[in-house]
Amino acid sequence: MEEISHHFGVVGASGVHGGHQHQHHHHPWGSSLSAIVAPPPPPQLQQQQTQAGGMAHTPLTLNTAAAAVGNPVLQLANGSLLDACGKAKEASASASYAADVEAIKAKIISHPHYSSLLAAYLDCQKVGAPPEVAARLTAVAQDLELRQRTALGVLGAATEPELDQFMEAYHEMLVKYREELTRPLQEAMEFLRRVETQLNTLSISGRSLRNILSSGSSEEDQEGSGGETELPEIDAHGVDQELKHHLLKKYSGYLSSLKQELSKKKKKGKLPKDARQQLLNWWELHYKWPYPSESQKVALAESTGLDLKQINNWFINQRKRHWKPSDEMQFVMMDGYHPTNAAAFYMDGHFINDGGLYRLG
């Protein structure tokens, strides 16, 4: 220990050797290192050394004045020498790792398949991108490919089987990824094209459509339907004329039959004015018992131009809405007479029973 201390010029504040006192100046780095690697000896050892050689060691302390001026060894002594060594190793390993990464990047860029790999990656970026973005990506790919060709012409390409396998596998993965990205986009575009075609099909001028629907309709159908409903005008500007004429020719018969069917349904819902007036006249004459016989229904059908089903439906609805049996007629309904049979007992305001004929009201 004395040799280490003497080498760094470190002893106690005062030392006794052969009865003489020697004073030495403290070396700051020596004090720091001695404090780390050589702590003060225990009291028993100090007593033995004093008895044997007459030399006494005082505990070594850190030179705080040296710490104030930023002595590096003293700063390490204030922390941990092992931590400092570990950090130095980590920094060295990190630098080595970074160097390896840069070397791998350089090998990938200089590989002959790098241009294909880059093109596959940019193709993935182009999926769904606006045209101007896709154009910029194409220009970037061309520029990088030109640079790589120049570099390969100067340096040449080194073969490395593992790197070749990596480049091929990664390129295949990017191609499949682009296909997965493109598939839903293509399906969406196809759907939009179908919708556009259907809209173009519907974009037929209202006038032409009305002419088709009106063909084959009789004057009676138009009166029975209460007049033809005006269709809204549709602007056919920009529609392909050839497609329009083709569709009109193909579906004109179907549209005409559809028009006739709709007219019949409207006719059933609302009877012609003249026919309805004749039925109302009969209703007023037979208000007390508005149940026409079968022969009367046939006569009404002939005079109005309606069928028997329309006649029956009109009288049923009219009785439900506008007629209530009189008190004298209630017993006819309560005794279970059918309205058709009951009409045979009622003639010109008289009701016939077993006792003869008598007048109601």
Swiss-Prot record:
Domain of life: Eukaryota
Gene Ontology biological process terms from the UniProt entry: anther dehiscence; negative regulation of auxin mediated signaling pathway; negative regulation of DNA-templated transcription; regulation of DNA-templated transcription
InterPro entries in the cross-refs: ELK_dom, HD, Homeobox_CS, Homeodomain-like_sf, KN_HD, KNOX1, KNOX2, TALE_homeobox
Tissue distribution of the protein: Expressed predominantly in shoot apices. Also found to a lesser extent in glumes.
Domain (ELK) ranges: 242-262
GO terms, molecular function: DNA binding; DNA-binding transcription factor activity; DNA-binding transcription factor activity, RNA polymerase II-specific; sequence-specific DNA binding
Complexes and interactors: Interacts with FTIP7.
Annotated protein name in UniProt: Homeobox protein knotted-1-like 6
